[in-house]
Regions:
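C-terminus-biased signal that marks the final domain/tail of proteins
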Residues: 1-2, 10, 16, 106, ...
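A contiguous strand-loop segment
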Residues: 1-81, 109, 114, 307
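Short, surface-exposed beta-strand-loop junctions and turns on beta-sheet-rich folds
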Residues: 9-11, 71-73, 143-145, 263-267
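Short acidic-glycine loop/turn motifs at beta-strand connectors
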Residues: 59-61, 130-133, 139-144, 149-152, ...
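A short, structured loop/turn motif at beta-sheet edges
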Residues: 59-61, 94-102, 206-211, 252-254
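Proteins synthesized as precursors that undergo proteolytic processing into mature forms
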Residues: 79, 83-115, 120, 212-219
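Catalytic cofactor-binding cores of redox enzymes
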Residues: 109-145
């Protein structure tokens, strides 16, 4: 089971991998009423130059999460549930859930608490997947959590608008059965990227091998890359696009991470089975921005102070 995402952002996110073994005591970093827990599973996350703010990751059970920007997000009003900060929320799910269903149950019991990071209160929605092929999307609209799971298609996600509206837009295009509809759009805006990704995912050939499957999925996700210097058209005038800083692809079945970093140009992978997730093992890190990273890099991780 494979899943891939692009990280499109207007500023360098200092992409850094962190390896967390199981058995670590953690805090939700959400102020009064923060959750406390001990990690049940090991994980690898992509942090923004810090182990306390991650946007992507996978655990040893094959559960993955991804945070993507969603303009218009309105988080829930703080209530009595134990809180977990936005930067820690993905780690919290990976630490405690083996699959999508368990992660969704946790999200009902523990509240995501927004926080400012590098001067910005980030509006995000979350995609999660597991090794069985189950997936879900979680959005925060009108101060309520909305979950797309089961009957709702959750195999593609970009940015705004919300997923329900994105799915409605698909009916405007010939690729999705509208004989009088539009051809595939070529812009870099989120709707155009959502339509293209949905279309190409439908037409990918059945792979004859795992390497073929990985190559096919990379070929599809690269069609949604935003080039550096791109602009987003709008009635009010073009605005600068957010270039693709990196692409991650997770093999949820075999616990492997494939990573393509744009600047500096790095293309490498991580075999999680070569990492030590045992209780008492050190937390490790590896910057994805070290020039010249190639091949399998699990041996390049170094210890880092945590808490």
């Amino acid at each position: 089971m494979l899943v891939a995402r692009n990280m499109d952002l207007a500023t360098d996110d200092l992409a850094t991998f962190y390896v967390f073994p199981k058995g670590i005591r953690k805090n939700g970093c959400a102020g009064t009423g923060s959750a406390n827990w001990t990690s049940k599973y090991g994980s690898v996350v992509v942090g923004a130059g810090t182990p306390y703010y991650s946007s992507d990751g996978i655990n040893t059970k094959g559960l993955a999460f991804h945070c993507l920007y969603l303009y218009g997000t309105e988080y829930e009003t703080r209530d009595q549930r134990p809180g977990v900060s936005l930067g820690q929320y993905g780690e919290f799910l990976l630490d405690n859930a083996a699959n999508v269903s368990e992660a969704l149950n946790l999200m009902e019991q523990f509240q995501l608490v927004p926080e400012s990071f590098v001067g910005t209160l980030w509006p995000i929605h979350i995609a999660i997947e597991d090794a069985s092929g189950d997936s879900a999307v979680i959005e925060f609209v009108n101060s309520q959590m909305t979950v797309y799971h089961g009957a709702a298609p959750t195999t593609v996600l970009t940015n705004e608008p919300t997923l329900d509206i994105q799915l409605q837009y698909l009916t405007y295009y010939t690729y999705f059965g509208n004989a009088n509809g539009y051809p595939l759009p070529g812009d870099v805006d989120p709707v155009s990227r959502f339509v293209r990704a949905s279309a190409f995912l439908l037409t990918l050939p059945k792979p004859s091998s795992l390497p073929d499957a990985i190559s096919y999925l990379f070929s599809a996700i690269r069609c949604e890359v935003e080039p550096f210097g791109s602009v987003v058209p709008s009635p009010a005038g073009a605005s600068p696009g957010w270039p693709t800083l990196w692409t991650s692809l997770y093999d949820l079945t075999n616990k492997r991470i494939y990573f393509d970093h744009t600047v500096p140009r790095n293309d490498f992978w991580i075999n999680m089975k070569k990492l030590n997730f045992s209780k008492g093992a050190r937390v490790l890190y590896l910057s994805a921005e070290i020039p010249g990273l190639k091949g399998e890099v699990s041996g390049l991780f170094k210890p880092v102070s945590y808490r």
